Amino acid sequence: MNASTKLLAPLVAALALAACNAGGSSIVPSAPAQSASLRLHAAAPRWMAQGLAKPACPMVTGVPTCLALIESRGGISPDVAGWAPIDFQTRYNLPSSTNGAGQIVAIVDAYDNPNVTDDLSTYRTQFGLGTANFTKYNQDGKTSNYPRGSTSWGVEIDLDVQMVSAACPLCTIYLVEANSSNNPDLEAAELTAVKLGAHIVSNSWICYSSNSCVKKADFQKPGVVYTAGSGDMGYNFNGNPESLDSVVSVGGTELRKSGSTYSESVWNGAGGGCSNNGSGAGVPKPSWQKDPDCAYRTDADIAAVADGVAEYDSYGGGGWFTVGGTSVATPLIAAVFALAGNASSQDAGKRFWSLKGRKRNHDLHYISSGNDGSCGGSYLCQAGTKQFHTYSGPGGWGTPNGIKAF
């Protein structure tokens, strides 16, 4: 961690106490600098304020950290607790049993989870997904000499490979483990993922409050779709790599089921909003974004479930437990790109911003309720405003309804 790195400062002592009582980090965010036109939120996201989860990795700004949130620990059955592959496949109308063979999805994470292969096998056996086509690499592209282990990043690693499996069981999955969570190592792993042949690279990590943490050149290779989580700290707590206009920024939703009917609302922790997140100048606005309330790159682009998902982790997680965060949604969206099979012809989030109304309304689920903070009623934090078509910052243009939007 470099000298400029700082822990997220406390909002109020009560929120810090709530996080501690939940077994989570006592580090909670301070509000970003006041916007000239919109009032930013001054509260921690609900998962933190109410002690509903704790971060798997330390919550810091300026350097990469993983986005997995631990919601429950061990001793539960995935049959009764946690969303499972059938829920994702049904809600998102995915052709998971027929599509995806030959498609390579790479996961880039830091450090090693030595149990990831066995954990993935347990997950896939539990849910009838068959044998995985899975390979683990180090950041140099070798299948040996892995980095040292980390139980924190181990939670993220298991989550990522299991979510790709959940949506695309026939996909080939490459896990590329960076030597550390330092920027140069993760960037090296990104390059290795592409050299290995992946056309889809999933990143469930973020540099909060930084638009210069990683080099855009490492996330802008022709014919490659990069997905990255928009963050778990709510409105305007975004950062690299998801705020790059060459990356698909993935927000989050809460999934509900009544009988056989699913519905979604914005997950309150989802990052999103305007990329001038209180740390200085934002990412320049790409020409394909025309929304009115942000003069910089607006995120997220798309979303998926980010709460209450079943995971199996024998390395540091004690078996089955439930997890959340945009680290759930990010590999799910990567897998949907693989199911569609068009990754090599995509242009990051531009695809979703360019959809016409009828196609958008048919091929994506409109997220019409929920927020990730307070922003004066703007679509940047509030779903369902229709101020800019069906878009909202935390929910993007919606969640998948089949693969035609991808």
Model-derived features: positions:
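Bacterial N-terminal signal peptides that target proteins for export
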Residues: 1-9
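Bacterial signal peptide processing site
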Residues: 21-24
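Substrate-binding/charge-relay-adjacent region of secreted/lumenal peptidase catalytic domains
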Residues: 28-252, 276-324, 330, 341-350, ...
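Walker A/P-loop NTP-binding active-site region of P-loop NTPases
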Residues: 336
